[in-house]
């Protein structure tokens, strides 16, 4: 093997994150927000599927929505910008198509969900959180490469492990617990 070449692969991801009821919630909120909304969700390891234990679901989701709604969308050269545009119109259309299909199948937009008019010089989409009763809805199942977080409820550890592993894009995952 005289000519072994180094290779760097860009792999697909639909990374799950789970928060158990004993987790440090502030730490989890900060990590989840940075993980999905950092780089406008355009990372193969963005934590785009969130599983919350039932006992903390409502309170945690309310705090997460509040954080997401405060994210400043804008141009990359503006000092107060916290999240910039998507990389292409094709990507924007794919996100919108998946959100529409998810809503038609019972998903519920909790914040964001529609393209932004912040500028006509880019493809802007706000931080978006969608509640999914089923972890196989389009925004929870398909790689979107955008600031779209699907949120689902679970009761027991074995249940959430099965759901986390039930996706073809298994690249990384995150667990918040004590």
Identify the meaning behind each predicted range.
Residues 18, 72-73, 117, 124-178:
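Conserved C-terminal structural/oligomerization subdomain of aldehyde/semialdehyde dehydrogenase
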Residues 1-134, 157-158:
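ALDH superfamily catalytic-core signature
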């Amino acid at each position: 093997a005289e000519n072994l070449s180094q290779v760097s692969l860009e792999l697909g991801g639909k990374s799950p994150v789970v928060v158990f009821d004993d987790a440090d919630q502030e730490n989890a909120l900060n990590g989840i927000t940075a993980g999905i909304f950092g780089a406008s969700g355009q990372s193969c390891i963005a934590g785009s599927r969130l599983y919350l234990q039932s006992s903390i679901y409502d309170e945690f989701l309310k705090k997460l929505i509040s954080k997401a709604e405060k994210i400043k969308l804008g141009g990359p050269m503006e000092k107060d910008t916290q999240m910039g545009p998507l990389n292409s119109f094709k990507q924007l259309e794919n996100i919108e198509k998946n959100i529409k299909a998810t809503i038609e199948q019972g998903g519920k937009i909790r914040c964001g969900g529609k393209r932004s008019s912040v500028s006509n010089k880019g493809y802007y989409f706000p931080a978006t959180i969608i509640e999914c009763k089923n972890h196989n809805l389009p925004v929870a199942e398909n790689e979107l490469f955008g600031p779209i977080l699907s949120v689902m409820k679970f009761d027991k550890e074995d249940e959430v492990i099965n759901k986390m592993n039930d996706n073809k894009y298994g690249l990384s995952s995150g667990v918040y617990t004590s």
